[in-house]
A protein has these predicted regions:
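C-terminal functional modules
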Residues: 285-345
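Bacterial N-terminal signal peptides that target proteins for export
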Residues: 2-12
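Extracytoplasmic small-molecule ligand-binding "clamshell" domains
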Residues: 29-110, 292-294, 309, 332, ...
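Bilobed "Venus flytrap"/periplasmic-binding protein-like clamshell domains
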Residues: 44-53, 63-78, 112, 132-188
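Bacterial N-terminal signal peptides
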Residues: 10-21
Length: 345
C-alpha cells in the first residue's frame, strides 16, 4: 500500500471524527511547523490516553509523565513558555494519521521506532526517549514464570501497535499457539485482562507496570514476566517533510541528556552556565539558535522548565514515582546505559 493509501485508510477508520472530538481544524501539514507553532501560540502534542509515568492526567487534571515533560521542554525552547502545550489524547491506531494531517505537531506517546514506520508512514523519529521491551503480565495465582507457559492462552493486546505484531511472530516462531484479544486502546486491553477475559496482557514493560498500579485487588496480585520479546525504543515522532522541525525536536532532547552529563540541573542551571567549559558544551551559540529558529538560551529554558533527563526520569518513572523503575539501558553511557548526547559544537 502506498503512503497515501495508508492515510486514506486511517482517515476512514476515524481520524475525521477525532477532529470534531478535540475541536481542532484540519489543515495542510505542509510548511514550516515551527512557524505554525509560533503563530498559533501553542505546541499541539499527541499523547496516550493515559499511561502513568509517560502521559496521564494527575489528580488536578494536569498532564504528567516523561512524554509530557519532554513536550514542555520543547515548548520552553521554542516558545519561551513550558505551559504553551495542548495535549491531544490519541489511540494507537489514530496517532500517525493525526500527525500526518497536522492535527498534532509531534507525537510523544509510547511510540516504537521502526523502519516500517519511517519508511512507509511519512514520519521520522527524532530520538529515543526511553529504551523499553515487550513483556507479559499475568495473575500471580496463575504461577507462570516464562512466556512459554502461555502456550494456547488468550492474550490481551492493543490494536495498531508493534506489540500486536511481535505477539504473533514470537509465538509462531516457537511453534506455540496464542489467541490474541485485540482491543482498540491500551486501557481497554488492560481492563479486559483485569476482568479475566485474557490469561495475560502484553505490551511495553513500562506500560504494563503503569497498568498494574490500577489493578483491582492491588498491584501485588499480578506479575510481569522477566522475559522481554522485543526491543522497543520509544521516542518523539515528527512528519518527514520538515527537517528544520526535526532538528529542533532532536536537539532539545539532546540538551536534556547533555545537561545530565554536565551535572546541570533545574536548580543550578543559571549558576553552572557561568562556567565557560559548561557553557561551551551546553550552548551552541546565538548564531545556531537563529539558524534553528529559536531565541538564544533555548537549551537553558528547556532544563529550567523540567530539569535534565535524569531528573525527568526519576520524577516520573524512577525512585520518585509510584512505578519505581530501574533506569537500566536509560542510564547515561558513562554509567553503562545507552543515553548519549552528540556534541553541540
Amino acid at each position: 500500500m502506498t503512503r497515501s493509501g495508508y492515510i486514506v485508510k486511517w482517515l476512514l477508520l476515524g481520524i475525521l471524527p477525532l477532529l470534531t472530538a478535540v475541536g481542532l481544524p484540519a489543515y495542510s501539514a505542509d510548511g514550516d511547523t515551527l512557524s505554525q507553532v509560533k503563530s498559533r501560540g501553542t505546541l499541539r502534542r499527541g499523547v496516550s490516553e493515559g499511561v502513568a509515568g509517560f502521559s496521564a492526567k494527575d489528580a488536578s487534571g494536569r498532564w504528567s509523565g516523561i512524554d509530557a515533560d519532554f513536550c514542555r521542554a520543547l515548548a520552553a525552547a521554542a516558545l519561551g513558555n513550558a505551559d504553551m502545550v495542548t495535549f491531544v489524547p490519541l489511540k494507537g491506531s489514530a496517532r500517525f494519521p493525526a500527525l500526518r494531517t497536522g492535527i498534532v505537531d509531534l507525537l510523544s506517546r509510547n511510540t516504537t521506532w521502526t523502519l516500517v514506520r519511517e519508511g512507509t508512514l511519512g514520519v521520522q523519529f527524532a530520538s529515543v526517549l526511553f529504551y523499553d521491551g515487550q513483556a507479559f503480565m499475568v495473575p500471580k495465582q496463575r504461577g507462570a514464570n516464562a512466556v512459554a507457559a502461555l502456550d494456547g492462552a488468550t492474550v490481551c493486546v492493543e490494536k495498531g501497535t508493534s506489540s500486536e505484531i511481535h505477539l504473533a511472530d514470537y509465538f509462531a516462531a516457537r511453534h506455540l499457539s496464542v489467541k490474541p484479544l485485540v482491543m482498540d486502546s491500551a486501557s481497554e486491553a488492560a481492563n479486559a485482562f483485569f476482568a479475566g477475559h485474557c490469561s495475560a496482557y502484553t505490551g511495553d514493560a513500562s506500560a504494563l507496570a503503569a497498568a498494574r498500579l490500577r489493578a483491582p485487588g492491588g498491584a501485588q496480585s499480578y506479575t510481569i514476566l522477566p522475559e522481554q520479546i522485543s526491543k522497543e525504543p520509544l521516542g518523539p515522532v515528527v512528519r518527514d517533510d520538515d527537517a528544520h522541525w526535526l532538528t529542533l525536536v532532536r536537539w532539545v532532547f539532546f540538551s536534556l541528556i547533555a545537561a545530565e552529563e554536565d551535572n546541570v540541573t533545574r536548580e543550578n542551571v543559571g549558576e553552572r552556565m557561568r562556567d565557560p567549559v559548561v557553557e561551551r558544551a551546553f550552548d551552541a551559540g546565538d548564531d545556531v539558535s537563529k539558524a534553528i529558529g529559536v531565541e538564544p538560551g533555548w537549551a537553558v529554558r528547556a532544563v529550567q522548565s523540567v530539569g535534565n533527563y535524569g531528573q525527568i526520569f526519576d520524577r516520573n518513572l524512577g525512585p520518585g514515582s509510584p512505578l519505581n523503575l530501574e533506569r537500566g539501558l536509560n542510564r547515561l553511557w558513562t554509567q553503562g546505559g545507552l543515553m548519549y548526547a552528540p556534541p553541540m559544537r
